[in-house]
Regions:
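Conserved ankyrin/ankyrin-like repeat signature
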Residues: 31-32, 65-66, 99-100, 133-134
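Ankyrin-repeat junction/capping positions
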Residues: 10-11, 44-45, 79, 113, ...
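Leucine-rich repeat
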Residues: 1-29, 34, 39-45, 52
Length: 174
């Protein structure tokens, strides 16, 4: 492979600051993406001139295997924003794959609440784009988080009540 002879080729920048990784991720070349990342994981740090990185572009195109490979290398990549403040989740809801939306939410649940520079979360974008199936995926995810937080809150309340009851018994006994 060319990279064995000249590793610097992986950082060659084309139009709009597009690297081989960004181009491969956009076009759906999973094997190329994996090979590039195995040679140089720092390629994940490079964004195009508009701030979009390989994850943004693969998410928009619905390339599930590439999104998974990128997130496996760096789950924090899901939080990175472009110049409009959009995450890969914002891009995915405009795209074609509900599975990519799920992968991003599983990688970092907090991104569901992140607004872009115009105040739009991914749910707002899905609604505006009339992406009903994506809206449902996000809504179900939010409901599962809500159930989790209700359970956690219940556990905390029970624990606090138990501690308070124990404290009251000690005070009463003294």
């Amino acid at each position: 492979m060319l990279l064995d002879h000249d590793p610097g080729l992986s950082k060659t920048v084309g139009q709009s600051n597009a690297t081989p990784l960004i181009t491969a991720a956009t076009r759906g070349h999973t094997a190329v993406v994996k090979e590039l990342l195995s040679k140089d994981p720092s390629l994940l740090e490079i964004s195009r001139s508009n701030g979009k990185n390989a994850l943004h572009l693969a998410s928009r195109q619905g390339h599930e295997d590439i999104v998974k490979a990128l997130l496996d290398k760096d789950p924090q990549l899901a939080r990175r924003t472009d110049k409009k403040g959009q995450t890969a989740l914002h891009m995915a809801v405009k795209g074609v794959s509900c599975e990519v939306v799920r992968l991003l939410l599983e990688a970092d649940a907090a991104i569901v609440m992140l607004p872009d520079k115009f105040g739009n979360t991914a749910l707002h974008v899905a609604t505006r784009k009339k992406r009903a199936e994506v809206y449902i995926v996000i809504a179900k995810f939010l409901c599962s988080l809500y159930r989790y937080f209700l359970l956690l809150t219940t556990i905390i309340i029970i624990s606090l009540n138990f501690m308070l009851f124990s404290l009251m018994r000690r005070v009463k006994l003294s």
